[in-house]
């Protein structure tokens, strides 16, 4: 089995969008003479399923404040928070009857964790690992070009406070046709490891797992495929075209409705928005503000605006709002919409 790692010019890449692009590139373009193991860890990100709505699934204000990106994957499933406290083990293998058999693909990981002292780890449900009833790993797999591509996360020491805040939407009154995530009780693996492994780094944990999975003594014994510069150029292009692209990560979201209301010195505002592919598709504004002009004109200006605060503010600031909203300012309306 070949080991492929996200290392370029001797430097480890921890951008979660790049890691996802690498997985897709490997699936579609690398056909070696053996199976492939692709482990990685990355900076904080929220990864959402193909059919999910990023706005519904996440706390957008928290993500922006902490510079945590949202990345949409090409497969279904729910939203997950990932940071450098988790190792993701991915594999690309010939389908010898293993597709859908999570017990079989998980068994080497279970044995490896037992070897490291986490003897309480066990399967739960169809595709999870738990310790003391708390989820420490979730798995998925698909068929890609006749091969089984799958993987699972291993939560060594994830920041659960950040996870809870990132995956807790704080916008009320949102209705969406997207698929909602199911929250699970989660736990960390570190506290269950043997004493000699309690202080290991995420890099050391990754290497220990690789050695156990590949049945080698040291990581230097692994059979590697090093991504070439040509490989990297295609990965770069895919990352920018898709996984760093707002249109894919947000604009590809299902249609949803959004409602906010607030009170200002200039009166009350009750705003209803329909969002389609990340843009305002319909808008209705109600309230007891004192305006002279037809409010439908202002609503029309907002239609077609990208549902990002800077875009909405740019639209509002380009209009003289006084004839429509009286004393209510663009900043007040923008803050209300994105509160």
Swiss-Prot record:
Regions that span the bilayer: none
InterPro entries found in the cross-reference section: aa-tRNA-synth_II/BPL/LPL, BPL_LPL_catalytic, Lipoate_protein_ligase_C, LipoylTrfase_LipoateP_Ligase
EC number, as in UniProt: 6.3.1.20
Region forming the signal peptide: none
GO cellular component, one term: cytoplasm
Residues where ATP binds: 73, 78-81, 135, 139
Pathway annotation from the record: Protein modification; protein lipoylation via exogenous pathway; protein N(6)-(lipoyl)lysine from lipoate: step 1/2; Protein modification; protein lipoylation via exogenous pathway; protein N(6)-(lipoyl)lysine from lipoate: step 2/2
Domain of life of the source: Bacteria
Annotated keywords: ATP-binding, Ligase, Nucleotide-binding
BP GO terms, sorted: protein lipoylation
An MF annotation (GO) of this entry: ATP binding
Span of domain BPL/LPL catalytic: 31-221
Residues the record lists as binding (R)-lipoate: 135
Catalyzed reactions per annotation: L-lysyl-[lipoyl-carrier protein] + (R)-lipoate + ATP = N(6)-[(R)-lipoyl]-L-lysyl-[lipoyl-carrier protein] + AMP + diphosphate + H(+)
Enzyme class label: ligase
Alphabetical list of Pfam families matching this protein: Lip_prot_lig_C, LplA-B_cat
Effect of residue 134 to R: Reduces enzymatic activity
Function: Catalyzes specifically the lipoylation of GcvH-L (SpyM50867), likely via the ATP-dependent activation of lipoate to lipoyl-AMP and the transfer of the activated lipoyl onto the lipoyl domain of the target protein.
Protein family (similarity comment): Belongs to the LplA family.
NCBIfam families (alphabetical): lipoyltrans (TIGR00545)
Protein name: Lipoate--protein ligase
